[in-house]
Amino acid sequence: MRTELISIPTDGVPLDGALHLPDGQIKGSALYFHGNTMNFYTGAARFLAPAMTAMGWAFLAFNRRGHDILTTRASRAAEGGAFQTVAESVADNRYAANWLAQQGYSNPVIIGHSYGGMLATRHVVDHPNTPALVLLSAGRGGQENVSGGRENLFAMDRTQELTDQAKALVAAGQGDALLSLPGWWWVISARSFLDRLQHVPDTLALAQQIRCPVLALRGDQEDRTRYPAEEFQAACAGPCEVRVMPMCDHFYNGCEEQVAKEVVTWLGRLQQL
C-alpha cells in the first residue's frame, strides 16, 4: 500500500486527507466519510485502508472541516466538529468527490461511518451514479433523533434548556460561543447545536431514493433504534444487505478485521456481477 497525504481545496479551509493506493493495478475506488468528532486516520478510516488496497482499490479518507471536537490549524483560531454545520459537511463531501474525480477516480463507492453514514445517504441521493454504498453504523438522523438513548449522546434530557441558551447566544451575535453538553461530544457552538437539531439528514427517508446496492452494518452492542440497519433495508429502493457483527461496539474495537473482511467480501462480490 502506498499512502499520499493530500489537501483538498474548498471555499474556505482546505481539507486534509490520505489517498491510499494499491501497489499493483487499480481496480476500483472508494471514498470514506468519517463520523462526528473523528478524522481520516482513526477508526474505520484507518483499518479499512489496507484491506481496500489489498483488493486493488484506491481509498480516500479525509477530514471534513468538522473533524475531531476542537482543533487548530495554522493559527490559534478554534476549528473542528464543535463548529460544524450540516451544509458544510455535505459540501465537504462534494469537494472530496470532485477532487477524487480529478485524480481519475469518478463515481467511487461511498463508505460512511455513523454521522458519515447519514451524510453518505444524502451524497448518494445527490450523486445517483454512485455504484454502491457501505453504511457502517449509520444513524437514523432526522429531527426526532438527536439526543439521549442508552449511549448518553448530545444534550440528553437537557435539549430544551440548551436550545434556549443556543438561541439566545445566536440572537446576541455569539453563534460561535461554546456550550457544554452533558453527553458526547461534550462541547458544541450555539450555531452548530441549532443546526444539528434542524438539518441532520433523515437516513430512512433518503433510503427511499437510493437504488444502488447497499451494505448496512452495525455491531450487536449498538442501539438498533439509533442505528436502524434493518429499517434502512426495508425502506431502501434498491438491494440492501444487513450485517450485525457479534461482540461489536460502535467503533468496532477488537472487531476491525472482521468488519474489514465483511466490507471487502461484499464489494468483491459486486465486482464479479
Regions found by a protein language model. Give the residues of each.
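Conserved alpha/beta-hydrolase
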Residues: 49-75
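Gly/Ala-rich beta-loop-alpha elbow adjacent to hydrolase catalytic centers
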Residues: 112-116, 120
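Short beta-strand element of the alpha/beta-hydrolase
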Residues: 27-35
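N-terminal cap/lid segment of alpha/beta-hydrolase-fold proteins
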Residues: 1-24
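Short beta-strand immediately N-terminal to the catalytic nucleophile in serine-hydrolase-like folds
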Residues: 107-112, 136
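The alpha/beta-hydrolase serine catalytic core
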Residues: 81-84, 88, 129-244, 249-264, ...
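The serine-hydrolase catalytic nucleophile loop
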Residues: 37-49, 227-229
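Alpha/beta-hydrolase active-site loop
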Residues: 80-102
